[in-house]
A protein has these predicted regions:
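Active-site loop signature of alpha/beta-hydrolase-fold enzymes
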Residues: 19, 61, 148
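Active-site-adjacent betaalpha module
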Residues: 1-10, 37-41, 48-49, 66-196
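N-terminal nucleotide-binding beta1-loop-alpha1 segment
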Residues: 11-16
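Short glycine-enriched, charge-decorated loop/helix-capping segments at active-site entrances
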Residues: 25-32, 64-67, 156-158
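Short acidic, Gly/Ser-rich segments with clustered Asp/Glu that frequently serve as metal-coordination loops
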Residues: 17-23
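Von Willebrand factor
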Residues: 46-61
Length: 196
């Protein structure tokens, strides 16, 4: 079944944190350098139209991680930082649904559709998307507002970030979510939304 935008979709901004600038820690090169710019467009649309959104923040338990709470990298990227009063959900695992009240907040507002963007495609974006799909939400991932990093396989083979990104998205498409670009999503949002 193809997902359709329903009601008031919630935007989940996953881990747009400064620590991801330390690319070597995450495997080296990253794809989609325009991901943050596209995320800004989407956040601006959600703010302007008073649609629900949540800033999701990763709090690493490892002092070595750039996302450890006492490091500068824990902070949100300047261009995507929450404004006063905007909801921020903090957790220490990959899924935005674990050890947060995200599901309760979505359900309390009658939200059945989520749009996932953020870092990184292969970890927290993928895990959050899979769980959203399993929980029964109509789920969308925005391919050019997410990004992946180079990876080393179990056999030592190196996989570049774009390949990691595309393979991850292909495992999500149709099974857990519908994958769209920023432009495709905005085009759909600018027509009457089903159920509104």
């Amino acid at each position: 079944m193809e997902n359709v935008l329903q009601g008031r979709p919630a935007l989940l901004l996953v881990d747009f944190q400064q620590g991801f600038e330390e690319k070597e820690y995450y495997g080296g090169e990253r794809n989609n350098p325009q991901a943050e710019q596209n995320a800004q467009k989407l956040l601006a649309y959600w703010r302007a139209n008073e649609l629900p959104f949540f800033h999701i923040q990763y709090s690493s338990v490892s002092p070595k991680s750039p996302l450890f709470p006492e490091k500068a990298g824990y902070a949100f990227k300047e261009e995507l930082k929450p404004l006063p009063g905007e909801p921020v959900l903090v957790r220490s695992v990959n899924s935005a649904f674990i050890n947060t009240d995200l599901q309760a907040q979505l359900d309390a507002q009658g939200i059945n559709t989520v749009v996932v963007i953020g870092l990184s495609t292969e970890h927290c974006v993928s895990t959050t998307t899979r769980m959203a799909g399993n929980l029964g939400y109509y789920t969308f991932v925005i391919s050019d507002a997410t990004a992946a990093f180079n990876k080393t396989g179990v056999n030592g083979e190196r996989f570049d970030a774009e390949l990691v990104h595309q393979v991850t998205l292909s495992t999500l498409q149709d099974e857990f979510a519908t994958v769209l670009t920023t432009q495709q999503l905005l085009q759909q949002l600018r027509v009457p939304v089903a159920g509104s």
